[in-house]
Regions:
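Short beta-strand->loop structural element characteristic of the AMP-binding/adenylate-forming
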Residues: 18-21, 48, 70-77, 149
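Alpha-helix capping/helix-boundary segments
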Residues: 79, 100-102, 132
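GHKL-family ATP-binding catalytic core of two-component histidine kinases
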Residues: 1, 21-23, 98, 133
Length: 165
């Protein structure tokens, strides 16, 4: 029987929250799926603003990057006031966040417009963990001039199950 690598608590959107055991194979398969979806390579650098106790931060930002041999810069959490300056400093090729974070990023952009436009290496942005409004997706893509990948997942599936290019 496979050993449990991590136990996660589901969000409980369809029933009461429950403990979900994830095996090493679950986590590796999910990381590889995300790596393939995003076409990550060793040249990529992820700026991780998601907490590592959340499957989004652990699976998508950290493990998918490591599966590609890419680098990850963990910011210590999301800070809307510092996001654009961190983006300019870290110079990632991608980042992943939840829609509420993307909204803060868009809302702060007029105040941080110089920093928002100083990352020529940014090649994609990922959103997951909640529904993304089409308008917000468009606003983020216009702000950064790169495509946004909208992913869908669930804790029980080790995170990402599908993604829109």
């Amino acid at each position: 029987m496979p050993t449990c690598a991590r136990r996660r608590t589901s969000s409980g959107t369809t029933a009461r929250p429950k403990q979900v055991p994830l095996t090493h194979a679950n986590l590796c398969a999910s990381a590889d799926n995300i790596r393939k979806t995003l076409q990550l390579t060793p040249e990529d650098r992820c700026m991780n603003v998601m907490p590592l106790f959340h499957i989004h931060g652990l699976g998508a930002a950290l493990l998918a990057s490591l599966a590609a041999g890419a680098s990850v810069v963990c910011t210590g959490g999301f800070d809307g006031l510092r996001f654009h300056s961190l983006l300019a400093k870290v110079q990632p090729t991608w980042y992943t966040a939840v829609p509420t974070m993307h909204q803060v990023i868009v809302d702060r952009a007029p105040r941080d417009i110089d920093a928002a436009r100083t990352n020529p290496g940014l090649r994609l942005i990922r959103s997951c963990s909640a529904a993304l409004a089409p308008r917000l997706m468009s606003d983020v893509e216009k702000l950064f001039g790169v495509p946004m990948v909208e992913a869908y997942g669930m804790t029980e599936a080790s995170h990402q199950m599908a993604a829109n290019p």
